[in-house]
Regions:
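Juxtamembrane intracellular "pre-TM" segments in multi-pass secondary transporters
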Residues: 4-15, 195-222
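Extracytoplasmic gate region of multi-pass secondary transporters
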Residues: 38-39, 217-270
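Conserved MFS/SLC helix-loop-helix module at the cytosolic interface between two early adjacent transmembrane helices
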Residues: 69-107, 276
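Cytoplasmic helix-loop-helix junction between adjacent transmembrane helices
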Residues: 114-151
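Intracellular juxtamembrane helix-capping segments at the cytosolic ends
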Residues: 123-136, 322-336
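Glycine-rich segments within core transmembrane alpha-helices of 12-TM secondary carriers
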Residues: 141-162, 348-358
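Helix-loop-helix hairpin linking two adjacent transmembrane segments in secondary transporters
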Residues: 147-192
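C-terminal transmembrane helical hairpin of 12-TM major facilitator-type secondary transporters
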Residues: 279-327
Length: 402
């Protein structure tokens, strides 16, 4: 086994580290629920607004691209102002589009605008990573980042709870999420604390982003994260539509199964971080992506949902979750502390963009071919390429500091 560089310390994190980790994870989950509010209702919006497969895919994908790109400036702003400012601020601002969805739901154009603004909820990832990274020493960092990554469970919350709440009133999911975000913003304002000795960059935002962008490892990690986390996001926003269209499930059943997929990714993300504290994270990433490649190609042959299709999706979820955790363990290992927020923003943005494209591709492929097989073949090819690159290149830079 390949072990990590000896720089890692076994010093026990302070109690404040665990408090910040817990509060940040809750915030990540709630804002991700808001970010993913449209996806579980995508088929309902498609029927209500008479949308084509492509337009329905575009509607659920808009928050993904905005949230992804927004991580770049939000990550850099977190480097400068800290999570104590940014977490309450972003949580409070996300309430606005959540409530705007209520009057906008009968217009495709208005819902596109709401989706654009909901993207704000997807940026908190770039706030939490530098916060957790600063509080935990290297020997505990991979697992801690994996625990924070469990906030992706907000997608599962959305998939499971949103359609069920909507049965009791179309406005109910949006009202509940808005109240939860308001309560969390107040909680974060009181409980989140930035590490007193954290380095605060003084250079302009554009300069810091430029410095992060010039690091080769930024783009290498971005590519790997686009496959791992991008796959999670893509399935999170499109799996309900796929299950409804191909396997003819009703929206509630489709949302429940999509939530199960998301739960598995959430469980395996800290496992990926934990393994990366013990084995080189590039090796963990390569193995996880190999699993994704194998079961994506099996799903391309359109097996019955029970049991083979379900097994394929759950094992892909395990691989994607593990890869997401291990890639960010590698980010924290090779990135200088003052640049973690900026690099995280870029890597998170590219990862999120990796989740924007597949729903559009899947919708376009289905419209043209009445089949999703080509889409799963493409996923298998990308995962295999990431596996080879992670094992062949990224293992050699684990102990470097740019």
């Amino acid at each position: 086994m390949e072990h990590l560089a000896p720089e890692q310390t076994t010093a026990r994190p302070p109690a404040a580290a665990y408090r910040n980790l817990a509060v940040a994870t809750v915030g990540f989950a709630l804002t991700f629920w808001a970010w993913a509010l449209i996806a579980p209702l995508g088929s309902d919006f498609g029927d209500r607004l008479n949308l084509s497969s492509f337009n329905q895919s575009f509607l659920v994908a808009v928050p993904v691209i905005v949230g992804s790109l927004g991580r770049v400036p939000v990550g850099a702003l977190t480097d400068r102002y800290g999570a104590k400012v940014m977490f309450p601020l972003i949580s409070a601002l996300t309430i606005i589009p959540v409530l705007l969805a209520i009057p906008a739901r009968n217009s495709f154009v208005a819902m596109l605008g709401v989706g654009f603004l909901l993207g704000l909820g997807g940026t908190t990832f770039a706030i939490g990573i530098p916060l957790v990274n600063s509080w935990f020493p290297p020997a505990h960092r991979g697992f801690a980042l994996g625990i924070f990554g469990m906030g992706m469970g907000g997608v599962a919350l959305s998939g499971y709870l949103t359609p069920r709440m909507a049965k009791h009133g179309e406005n109910l999911p949006f009202i509940v999420v808005a109240i939860a975000l308001a309560a969390y913003a107040l909680l974060a304002l009181v409980l989140i604390t930035d590490r007193p000795d954290r380095p605060i960059p003084t250079s302009p935002l554009a300069t810091r982003l430029g410095q992060a962008g010039r690091l080769r490892v930024t783009w290498e990690l971005s590519g790997l994260y686009a496959i791992g986390f991008g796959g999670i996001v893509a399935f999170g926003v499109y799996l309900p539509t796929y299950l409804k269209t191909w396997y003819e499930l009703d929206p509630t059943d489709a949302g429940t199964k999509a939530a199960g997929f998301a739960v598995v990714t959430v469980i395996f993300r800290p496992i990926g971080g934990w393994l990366s504290d013990r084995i080189h994270p590039a090796t963990v990433t390569a193995c996880a992506l190999a699993v994704v490649a194998l079961f994506a190609i099996l799903q391309a042959f359109d097996p019955k949902l029970n049991p083979m299709g379900t097994v394929n999706f759950l094992l892909m979820a395990a691989g994607l979750g593990t890869a997401s955790g291990s890639v960010f363990a590698l980010v924290s290992q090779v990135t200088p502390q003052p640049q973690v927020g900026s690099v995280t923003g870029i890597v998170g943005a590219i990862g999120g963009l990796g989740g924007f494209v597949p729903p559009l591709v899947m919708g376009a492929i289905y419209s043209a071919k009445d089949s999703y097989s080509i889409g799963f073949m493409l996923l298998s090819d990308l995962a295999l390429a990431g596996c080879v690159y992670a094992y062949g290149r990224m293992r050699n830079i684990g102990a470097q500091r740019p």
